[in-house]
Swiss-Prot record:
Entry-linked SMART domains: CHZ
Name assigned to this protein: Histone H2A.Z-specific chaperone CHZ1
UniProt biased composition (Acidic residues): 41-68, 102-124
Organism: Coccidioides immitis (strain RS) (Valley fever fungus)
Top-rank lineage group of the source organism: Eukaryota
GO cellular component, one term: nucleus
Gene name of the record: CHZ1
Subunit structure: Forms a heterotrimer with H2A.Z-H2B, stabilizing the association of the histone dimer. Also, with a lower affinity, forms a heterotrimer with H2A-H2B.
Main localisation: nucleus
Amino acid sequence: MSANQDITLTEGEGSRPAGDKGKGKAVGSEDIPMEQYSGDSETEESDAADDETFPEDDIEEEEEAGDDNLERISEENIIPGGRRTRGKVINFAEAAEKVEADDAMDDDDDEEYKQRDEDDEMQG
């Protein structure tokens, strides 16, 4: 828009007070008193929600149906020799002692720690 053009305001534009930013109530809206609302609308909504089916319900039903069709596992699929540890023999008693020793070392570190005060940081 150039400075030479005239700007026309329609009725109502520009007639607002300077402090009014248009955030008031909408024109023509009416407040409805609470007495006019009936309590039945809430129960109708909750009844309607109970009648709806949700996809999660269908999934659970399919999983339950799938559990009934379990077949026996073939022993040919079981790996012999306990290769879950890739052949390494684990001494669980020794591993437990090692874990306890590591925990004891951590406790020593906690006892030596002294928290610095904020006042010490500002003075030093």
